[in-house]
Structures are given as C-alpha cells and as structure tokens.
Amino acid sequence: MQEFSLWCDFIERDFLENDFLKLINKGAICGATSNPSLFCEAITKSAFYQDEIAKLKGKKAKEIYETLALKDILQASSALMPLYEKDPNNGYISLEIDPFLEDDAIKSIDEAKRLFKTLNRPNVMIKVPASESAFEVISALAQASIPINVTLVFSPKIAGEIAQILAKEARKRAVISVFVSRFDKEIDPLVPQNLQAQSGIMNATECYYQINQHANKLISTLFASTGVKSNSLAKDYYIKALCFKNSINTAPLDALNAYLLDPNTECQTPLKITEIEAFKKELKTHNIDLENTAQKLLKEGLIAFKQSFEKLLSSF
C-alpha cells in the first residue's frame, strides 16, 4: 500500500544494530520515532549504554544525554537514508526537543535549530510538542526548512490549525502526530461496553479529516500512541483501524510485529463525519466531551515527557 506507511516507535542501541535493520531490509517499516520516555527506558535499562556513560562521567547531565541520543539518532538516520534517497517522503527518524522548553518559543526554536544543525542529516525530523508556544515554533522551523514532527496532538481543532500553518510555510516534510489509545484508556472506564475502544479512533479520524483539509504532498497525519492499553484488544487494533490513505502509523514493537503477521492489503475507508458526530453525542450523555478530554491528555502528556526526561537526566 503506497498510500500508507508504517514506522517504528522505539529506539535502543542493540535494537538499532539488529532488528531495526531487519525491519527496514524486509520493507516492513520506512521510518521511526523517538521521545523522551523511550530514551529514558532505553538508556536507564539497557546495558549497551553503560560503558559510554562511564566515559562521559563529569559532564553535565544534558550533555551526556545528547551524546547518547544523537549517536542513536545518527545510527537510525544512516539505516533509513536509502529509503529517504529513494523517496524523500520516507526514511525519517524523529528527535524531540527538551520537554522543559515547551512553554518558551525562543529557546525551543534555538534548540531545534541547534540539534538539526549538529545532526546535519536531511532525514531527521525535529519533534515539537503541541503546547501553547508550538505555533510560533512550528512556523519558525518550517521557514528554516527543517523537517517537523508536531507531537502530542489530541485535539482535532489544534490538528487543523497546525496543518494550516504547515500548508502555508512548510518547505520540507512534516507530520502531525495524533495520539490515539490514551483516549480509550481515559474514557473506557466511564462508559458502557458498546462505547468502549472507540473514542481514540473516532477522535483520530476527526483529526485526520481536519489535517487533510490543508494537507499537501509534504504534510501527513501520523497516528501515534497506537499500542493497546487493554488486554481485550488485538495488539495491532489501532494500526488496522487507522490504515488510511496519506497517513503514517508509528507503532511499538508488539503492535508492529502483530500487524506484520497479517497486514492490511488495502487502505481502510475512514468513518464518516456524521458517524463521529453521532458517537460524540452519545458520549455527552455520559458527561464526556472529547475536546475537554483532549486538553486534559495534552497536559498529562507534557508532564509525562518532562518526568521521563528528568528521570533520565538524574540517572547520570
């Protein structure tokens, strides 16, 4: 399916040297993403970083982090470069800016430009969280011809506004990362069974429609947070349900591997807006508003990435 791309939402040194290459070589994935939580998990729990950390002892914590993280990003970039050279819409790896800068546009812009210049790779995307300062940051990076991944997008309204900016100003590839499964984790305990495991897909589909109103060949919806939070769902539930044209799904390894055992042969037709509106109306009878939930999940997501980054830095 040329219209749909699968990326890997995982990064870790041993993985990059082994299974990551296998996934690329067999055509299973054509991109990858990282975030502060993934780096925290990898660096604090994997033995493959310990010798390097020991050699960096005495340096500032953020300097140690960047030395380790940028090495991984460069390795992923090199592995994905043949895909990028064949088709500049594919073959990207994402690196997120310091999550503690999310409310400071100027510092966010400076850090993003510094990281992109340091890495000096055309297939690196700089990740920017969809905080209040994001619009200024996105605009500046787009004008600087930096590939962008706008992350922690929960609201269809925000998704559309971001797409509008990128449609006007993006000179390089850009994706808008719409988070999915966290909606179901939040809402399912509050609704009857017939409404469960649907909120994430409904909201993500509405985001997809909003983005596509402005999307061009440089801009795509990227569905993220697509690992299931419930044992009752198939591991690849969110990949299969959101297999839309001109979209990307970045998935954790368990979801990715499950999907590859039985992949879709063609893209899904998205739910109609009328179906989404009917579902939202049904949710409101249970005092649930998806836009309010989106705002709550964004705040929690920003906090979670800060906590992971702080935990990682303190481990040094």
Curated annotation (Swiss-Prot):
Its EC number is 2.2.1.2. The keyword Cytoplasm applies. The keyword Transcription does not apply. CDD domains: Transaldolase_like. It comes from the Bacteria. The active site is at residue 127. One of its GO terms (cellular component) is cytoplasm. InterPro entries: Aldolase_TIM, TAL/FSA, Transaldolase_2, Transaldolase_AS. Keywords: Cytoplasm, Pentose shunt, Schiff base, Transferase. SUPFAM superfamilies: Aldolase. It catalyses: D-sedoheptulose 7-phosphate + D-glyceraldehyde 3-phosphate = D-erythrose 4-phosphate + beta-D-fructose 6-phosphate. GO terms for molecular function: transaldolase activity. It is an enzyme of class 2 (transferase). GO terms for biological process: carbohydrate metabolic process; pentose-phosphate shunt. Pathway: Carbohydrate degradation; pentose phosphate pathway; D-glyceraldehyde 3-phosphate and beta-D-fructose 6-phosphate from D-ribose 5-phosphate and D-xylulose 5-phosphate (non-oxidative stage): step 2/3. Pfam families: TAL_FSA. Transaldolase is important for the balance of metabolites in the pentose-phosphate pathway. Belongs to the transaldolase family. Type 2 subfamily. This is Transaldolase. The gene is tal.
